[in-house]
Amino acid sequence: MSDTPKPPSNTLSLKRETATEAPKLEERLHKVLAQAGLGSRRALEQRISNGLIKVNGDIAQLGMSVKSGDKIELDGRSFVASALTEPARVLIYNKPEGEVTTREDPEGRPTVFETLPVLKGARWIAIGRLDINTTGLLLLTTDGELANAMMHPSSEIEREYVVRVRSPEGEEHVQDELLEQLTRGVMLEDGTAKFDTIERIGNTDSHDWFRVVVKEGRNREVRRLWESQGCQVSRLKRTRYGSVLLPRELLRGQSTELPKTQVEALRTQLKLEKDMPLALTLQPIIGQRRSAKATLHVNRNDNNKHAYHNNHSTADESRELRRFDTLRDDRGRGQGKHHFKDRLTVSGEAAAKQAHKPFKQYKPKNDRSLSEGSPATFQSWYVPEGVSTGPRNHRNAGAGNGAHPNKKSPNPNTRNTPGQQTRKSPYKYPNNAPNFPSDHATPTFNPYGNPGQKTGAGRPNNSGGKYNRNRGPRYP
């Protein structure tokens, strides 16, 4: 035997070599929630202070940080903090009048988020806001870090607007002295504000058109600057945000996505690092269900002894089990077409809606015995006991009075004619009608008619043959 060691065999194993784990990303809780698009940072901080958010099972505190992998509970749903690995996306939206830049409006007005493309695992974050009467360029992104960098005043990103202004009272047009005042600066309620650039681009008999540029995103800043000088803004439209221009071919209410090259150029301009997950976001836990409404079951007949409370809905269970339902008709084992009456004919969801309904109780049937004096009690006088009258339609079986009025009666004088169907006779004698004892009192009377004789001529004398049965007594 040689002493050379054998080469190690390639065995299958599920274990992997321990790799150096990257440091976990850590960020403030309200920042992570805002990155996921669950609201503004100020509103989320208020919810954290109210104790409405939990982190790893404990109530979150204001100012705390979370790491990737932490479990966050909000509004009855669970999320996991994870690094944002997907590339940032930027959307250009041409906002029309009448829409507000918010996710939910308490007054029920339409919002810009109702017409945007649907995302999975992320939400659109508006870069700045436009009031309900302002139209034009509105940028939205999935990168919260990019949105904050573009909105922060320290970035000094230009916002360009086209505005139509009505001059102050007593003047036909806006004077140049007023424009110089707006470029130097005007004191507003929240501090000094100014236009970085003002350019006159046209005028009419009652209005003047200007192109203005600001580097801040205060609330209604452009309108308040003009109103401070006695002017009235009748139309306002944003045409540029930083290096992004509003496309001329983009109609109002439509959106288009910014190319990835321009998105990377924006990040480079704002000095944001490349290929680094600089933000945490929330990913929903797969397989979780929304908490169903609790139901209370009370049995009134048992004085609430068997009442119970559960935290699930039968309708939800039936909806999940409905895929296993097999709708079929159960037949009996014997011959014939006898089916069970209580076969499954509805879906599980429909059955769950009727689960708490009581069974239908039928009242006992009343006694249907005939009262005295009823004409039906005299049936024994018309038909004596022991006499069989045959089926119900025997009185209508004669010639000319068929049970089916639409069918023609066969000719009684012709029998077994080739090509003609022979009429069935239940009693197998010529007139297809029985003889009653009451008919014997008047032998010349035939209540069923005789096509061979006139009325009152008596019965035909069939003195033999197979029709000589059940003729009754003979008369001289």
UniProtKB/Swiss-Prot annotation:
- Alphabetical keyword list: Isomerase, RNA-binding, rRNA processing
**S4 RNA-binding domain location:** 27-96
| Matching SUPFAM superfamilies | Alpha-L RNA-binding motif (SSF55174), Pseudouridine synthase (SSF55120)
Check the record and name the SMART domains matching this protein. S4 (SM00363)
Q: Which Gene3D superfamilies match?
A: Alpha-L RNA-binding motif, Pseudouridine synthase I, catalytic domain, N-terminal subdomain, RNA-binding S4 domain
Residues of the active site are: D131 (nucleophile)
Which EC numbers does the record give? Answer: 5.4.99.22
Per its record, the protein catalyses: uridine(2605) in 23S rRNA = pseudouridine(2605) in 23S rRNA
Role summary:
Responsible for synthesis of pseudouridine from uracil-2605 in 23S ribosomal RNA.
Checking PANTHER family in the record gives: PSEUDOURIDINE SYNTHASE FAMILY PROTEIN-RELATED (PTHR47683), RIBOSOMAL LARGE SUBUNIT PSEUDOURIDINE SYNTHASE B (PTHR47683:SF3)
The UniProt family comment states: Belongs to the pseudouridine synthase RsuA family.
What protein name applies here?
Answer: Ribosomal large subunit pseudouridine synthase B
Task: Give the organism's phylogenetic lineage.
Answer: Bacteria, Pseudomonadati, Pseudomonadota, Gammaproteobacteria, Lysobacterales
Q: Which gene encodes it?
A: rluB
